[in-house]
């Protein structure tokens, strides 16, 4: 049984980790931390976990995290980089759901995240936790940088095309929409129902923090830098990301066969039949990316539609998928969840 600690268990990704791990047959949550809510029972804050998680939140100092086999950081950016080194020195493996270890260029990370990196020496050792790309490296990793939500949907959509060398990588476009839970569980004017409901807007057009992460992953697949325009949007839904991706074909190729072949052995990527249009509700609550590929009017533009639940395949579910790989467990352990409908 893998002993699990969660740092920052009161946010949406934290409670999603608790939901998934509560039914995991080979993992046991032994500590959940929150400085602000220390002493409060988990099932008091989250009644959905009554009868599933018999723990109270504790401070990180009281949590005895060094006795865990693995610790998840479901914290804001900048926390894991301060605390991960001590846990790693104690032999604990770490999965960071924030962005502290995702970008290999530390100076680039500091520019986008507006703070000095506290553990730059760990960045090179961190494995980027996208299993569909780095499965073997994740198995032996001590420190995993769990991908962001937009980067997961965008990379899984573009990768078959880039790996096959059939598109112009100088002018990629990612037009993405997210539900409000992507902003986290905090009080902000823009996330209020009266502000976000019945409305739809783009944001971060001049530059979003996920842009360098996406470019890094696509450049690695391409073997050279890529040109990417990434525009995120906020939609009046709670969960879900819909990425509409555009690229120019440079070779004639059977796109459906290309995508089906690339993901044939991937349990958590579902390539839909030709002509399909995936819906965000079809992946709600599940660790699943659904993809459809189109070539409108048989032209030289390829359009890829990629949908995920931002809290599951875009965060906590992918983190549990990484845990399974790190501890030699079946990759779908605890993740065989049917999406919620309606």
From Swiss-Prot:
Catalytic activity: N-acetyl-L-glutamate 5-semialdehyde + phosphate + NADP(+) = N-acetyl-L-glutamyl 5-phosphate + NADPH + H(+)
EC number(s) stated in the UniProt entry for this protein: 1.2.1.38
Any matching Pfam family: Semialdhyde_dhC_1
A GO cellular component entry from the record: cytoplasm
Active site: 149
Gene Ontology annotations of biological process type: L-arginine biosynthetic process
Domain of life the protein comes from: Bacteria
UniProt protein name: N-acetyl-gamma-glutamyl-phosphate reductase
Molecular function as annotated in GO: N-acetyl-gamma-glutamyl-phosphate reductase activity; NAD binding; NADP+ binding
Keywords: Amino-acid biosynthesis, Arginine biosynthesis, Cytoplasm, NADP, Oxidoreductase
SMART domains named in the record: Semialdhyde_dh
Coiled-coil regions listed in the entry: none
Listed pathway(s): Amino-acid biosynthesis; L-arginine biosynthesis; N(2)-acetyl-L-ornithine from L-glutamate: step 3/4
PANTHER family membership: N-ACETYL-GAMMA-GLUTAMYL-PHOSPHATE REDUCTASE, CHLOROPLASTIC-RELATED (PTHR32338:SF10), N-ACETYL-GAMMA-GLUTAMYL-PHOSPHATE REDUCTASE, CHLOROPLASTIC-RELATED-RELATED (PTHR32338)
Subcellular location: Cytoplasm
Its job: Catalyzes the NADPH-dependent reduction of N-acetyl-5-glutamyl phosphate to yield N-acetyl-L-glutamate 5-semialdehyde.
Main enzyme class: oxidoreductase
Similarity remark: Belongs to the NAGSA dehydrogenase family. Type 1 subfamily.
Cystine pairs: none
Entry-linked InterPro entries: AGPR_AS, AGPR_type-1, NAD(P)-bd_dom_sf, NAGSA_dehydrogenase, Semialdehyde_DH_NAD-bd
């Amino acid at each position: 049984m893998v002993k699990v600690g969660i740092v920052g268990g009161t946010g949406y990704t934290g409670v999603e980790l608790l939901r998934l791990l509560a039914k995991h047959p080979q993992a046991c949550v032994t500590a959940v931390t929150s400085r602000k809510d220390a002493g409060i029972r988990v099932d008091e804050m989250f009644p959905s976990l009554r009868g599933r998680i018999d723990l109270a939140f504790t401070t990180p100092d009281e949590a005895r995290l060094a006795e865990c086999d693995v610790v998840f950081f479901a914290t804001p950016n900048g926390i894991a980089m301060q605390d991960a080194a001590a846990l790693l020195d104690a032999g604990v493996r770490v999965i960071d759901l924030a962005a502290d270890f995702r970008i290999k260029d530390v100076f680039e990370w500091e520019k986008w995240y507006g703070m000095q990196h506290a553990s730059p020496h760990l960045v090179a050792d961190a494995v980027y936790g996208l299993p569909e790309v780095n499965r073997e490296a994740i198995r032996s990793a001590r420190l995993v940088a769990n991908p962001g939500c937009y980067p997961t949907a965008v990379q899984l959509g573009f990768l078959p095309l880039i790996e096959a060398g059939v598109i112009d990588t100088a002018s990629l476009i990612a037009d993405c929409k997210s539900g409000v839970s992507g902003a986290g569980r905090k009080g902000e004017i823009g996330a209020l129902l009266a502000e976000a409901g019945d409305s739809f807007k783009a944001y971060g057009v001049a530059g979003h923090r996920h842009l360098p992460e996406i470019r890094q992953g696509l450049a690695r697949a391409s073997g050279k830098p890529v040109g990417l325009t990434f525009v995120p949007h906020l939609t009046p839904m709670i969960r879900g990301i819909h990425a509409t991706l555009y690229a120019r074909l440079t070779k004639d190729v059977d796109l459906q066969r290309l995508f089906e072949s690339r993901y044939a052995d991937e349990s958590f990527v579902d390539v839909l039949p030709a002509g399909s249009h995936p819906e965000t509700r079809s992946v709600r609550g599940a660790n699943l990316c659904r993809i459809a590929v189109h070539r409108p009017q048989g032209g030289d533009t390829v359009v890829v539609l990629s949908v995920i639940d931002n809290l599951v395949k875009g965060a906590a579910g992918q983190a549990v998928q990484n845990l399974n790989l790190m501890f030699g467990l079946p990759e779908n352990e605890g993740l065989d969840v049917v999406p919620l409908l309606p």
